[in-house]
């Protein structure tokens, strides 16, 4: 996986400003961590501490996506499309 792959997700004009705290950037980072941990767990099925870490990151990403969906539905839909994430089921 490419370390600087977020360049294609975040628009080029926004690179000048520091975007590390934006919701989109945080969700992108969590998604990368989730993909890395998922591939790790395919090889090491009994690594329970990594499973716990994956569940924690999934929860954090879910909360951030819920926040973004309430605040700005357009940015939420755009982010989900770019990262190729399923929209969570509503209860």
Swiss-Prot record:
In the UniProt record, does the keyword Plastid occur? Answer: yes
- Which PROSITE patterns did the record assign? RIBOSOMAL_S15 (PS00362)
Q: Name one Pfam family in it.
A: Ribosomal_S15
What's in the keyword line of the UniProt record?
A: Chloroplast, Plastid, Ribonucleoprotein, Ribosomal protein
Q: Where in the cell is it found?
A: Plastid, Chloroplast
> Which superkingdom, per the lineage?
Eukaryota
State the CDD domains in the record. Answer: Ribosomal_S15p_S13e (cd00353)
List the molecular function annotations (GO) for this entry.
structural constituent of ribosome
Q: Which GO terms describe its biological process?
A: translation
* Assigned GO CC terms: chloroplast; ribonucleoprotein complex; ribosome
Main localization of the protein described in the UniProt heading: plastid
The record describes its quaternary structure and partners as: Part of the 30S ribosomal subunit.
Q: Which family does it belong to?
A: Belongs to the universal ribosomal protein uS15 family.
- What is this protein called in UniProt? Small ribosomal subunit protein uS15c
Query: What is the species listed in this Swiss-Prot or TrEMBL entry?
Result: Ceratophyllum demersum (Rigid hornwort)
Q: What is the lineage of its organism?
A: Eukaryota, Viridiplantae, Streptophyta, Embryophyta, Tracheophyta
């Amino acid at each position: 996986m490419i370390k600087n792959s977020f360049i294609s997700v975040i628009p080029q004009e926004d690179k000048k400003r520091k975007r590390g705290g934006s919701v989109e950037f945080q969700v992108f980072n969590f998604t990368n961590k989730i993909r890395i941990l998922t591939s790790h767990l395919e090889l090491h099925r009994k690594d329970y501490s990594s499973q716990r870490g994956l569940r924690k990151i999934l929860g954090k990403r879910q909360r951030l996506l819920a926040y973004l969906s309430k605040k700005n539905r357009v940015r939420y839909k755009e982010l989900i499309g770019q990262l190729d994430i399923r929209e969570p089921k509503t209860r």
